[in-house]
């Protein structure tokens, strides 16, 4: 599947949370809570928290984890885009990430912003990046250790590459899909109420969409449908059914989008 995420029309470039079922099932993409607990003291493993809710990290995080504030560290608030290559490299080095580091990201809310953060790593060509399957929800439910001390790691030496634009979709791409001038399929991963225009944004969010509704031709698969009750991704067969129900089978390019980008 050729999957891209939307940038344009007021949306930030977003994380590739919708992937092929084969990719989600691969052990080189996800790590378990058991694996991470065994590797908490591994000097070649760096843990990064990217949560939606402010203050979650400070109240308690996976031991050794470094906090990335999605609205400050991973984006440029002026350009309304992902962090620049230079700023992202500085962030990673400051966080102790080197060329031989295995980086594991996790967060709250079904790993919404953690998965988006992993996508930013992917855009800049950083290798050995994993997502903790189940995120904070599963880690806490299993009563695994939490720490409230901030981590100050030794600086790393990673070098990030120029942004891979093939992983991104831009406004002309979306317009072409909406006007049926391409075979690209559009997937809106927001809630059904957002998709149907009943609300402008999720409850409690201050930053609203300019207009309610969805891009013409887009199908709706809310992000939460991709995960099980414990926060882990559903099985490959389950995901095939979820996306197959709206005509997404991986045979055509897909563009995902949401409100400002991070959920998709």
Enumerate the language-model features and the residues they cover:
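Thiolate-centered catalytic microenvironments shared by cysteine-dependent enzyme domains
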Residues: 83-181, 198-199, 213, 259, ...
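Solvent-exposed loop/turn segments at secondary-structure junctions
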Residues: 52-55, 71-75, 109-112, 136-138, ...
């Amino acid at each position: 599947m050729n999957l891209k995420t939307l940038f344009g029309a007021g949306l930030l470039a977003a994380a590739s949370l919708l992937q092929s079922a084969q990719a989600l099932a691969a052990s080189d993409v996800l790590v378990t809570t058991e694996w991470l607990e065994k590797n908490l003291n591994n000097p070649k493993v760096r843990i990064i928290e990217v949560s939606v809710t402010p203050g979650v990290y400070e109240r308690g995080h996976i031991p050794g984890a470094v906090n990335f504030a999605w609205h400050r560290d991973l984006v440029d608030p002026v350009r309304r885009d992902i962090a620049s290559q230079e700023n992202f490299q500085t962030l990673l080095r400051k966080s102790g990430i080197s060329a031989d580091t295995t980086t594991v990201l996790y967060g709250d809310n079904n790993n919404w912003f953690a998965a988006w953060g992993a996508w930013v790593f992917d855009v800049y060509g950083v290798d050995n990046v994993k997502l903790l399957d189940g995120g904070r929800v599963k880690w806490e439910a299993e009563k695994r250790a939490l720490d409230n001390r901030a981590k100050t790691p030794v600086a790393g030496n990673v070098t990030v590459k120029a942004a891979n634009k093939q992983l991104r979709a831009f406004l002309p791409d979306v317009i072409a899909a909406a006007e049926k001038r391409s075979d690209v399929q559009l997937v809106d991963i927001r809630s059904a109420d957002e998709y149907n225009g009943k609300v402008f944004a999720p409850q409690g969010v201050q930053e609203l969409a300019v207009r309610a509704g969805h891009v013409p031709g887009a199908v709706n698969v809310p992000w939460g449908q991709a995960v099980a009750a414990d926060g882990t991704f559903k099985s490959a067969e389950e995901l095939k059914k979820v996306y197959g129900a709206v005509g997404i089978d991986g045979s055509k390019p897909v563009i995902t989008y949401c409100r400002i980008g991070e959920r998709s």
